[in-house]
Amino acid sequence: YGKSKLMIENVLEDYATAYDFNYTALRYFNAAGSFEGLGYQLDPKEHIIPIIVGKALTGEKLTINGNDYETADGTCERDYTHVVDIASAHMAALNYLFDGGTGGSFNIGGGSSSSIDTVVAEVEKQLELTIDKEYGPRRDGVPAKTSANIAKAWDEMGWESSFTIQDIVRDEIAYQQSLIKK
């Protein structure tokens, strides 16, 4: 996945050089959350925040893959990005290009990482319950931590994240609860 994205960025860069073409490539870090009743639906779910919220709402046991990573609490840390922040990054990228920006690749993230255990604790806090959880083995090839350096997005496009992990969890809970009510 990462290699194919890098290949496309390289093609864009070569094309831009050859044909005097400006572009932006946005690198999203862990899209999450929902907006006005629109959310992320996969079956089976593949992203951790919808999984955690779903398990909390159904009372099913949550399995966290690995608690022996080189992080503060032993669980993976990820930089989660609210879908509205991603939308605003697209607008900033368009405005940047329309205003004469030269283009390039930009990291789009929340600017800080949250561990899986931190996300679980936030879901528990907002739902006022305790999630039945267990720790399983690590998944192969999963890095301990990812975090977006969004300095270039701010410096060149004037973009920064507006939503926190608390906002992301709140919106994901509201979205999944709306599905239950239907």
What are these regions, as identified by a protein language model?
Residues 1, 6, 37, 53-54, ...:
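Short capping/connector residues at structural and topological boundaries
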Residues 13, 49, 87, 91:
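Short alpha-helix within the catalytic core of nucleotide-sugar-dependent glycosyltransferases
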Residues 36-63:
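Mobile, glycine-enriched helix-loop/loop "lid" segments at the mouths of ligand-binding/catalytic clefts
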